Amino acid sequence: MPFFYQLAIPAPKAAEGSYNKGEASRGQALFAGRGNAPPATCHPLYIEPGSSLHTPEEIGIDDFRSSRSPTKQYRTTPLRGLWSHQKGGFYHDGRFQTLDEVVEHYDQHLKLGLVEQEKKDLVEFLKSL
């Protein structure tokens, strides 16, 4: 069960000064708010304690990669340590190169109506994890 062993390893913390603390704080409140809509429902503890699978329709993307999976679904990836991703690969299938693109996707797919500052706050929060 190497998966559970991996969950026991703490994610590295974001370096001091690598994100804006004020914006990250507002982003955290926003992430947990807005009716607890995704991504908060996909990532309630910022990590996924077990297996959480989502259909392409749930997360607003095509089934190109999930169609090759036995379950035909995407796995929720941990959010902690996102700041360490240097080459993109964000989202359930790794399709986005930046966190800005992920936030924009959620804003459009879920019709959240985020203003630019809220988007920036969410990105800073994700960078802080």
Predicted regions and their residues:
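Periplasmic c-type cytochrome electron-transfer domains
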Residues: M1-L129
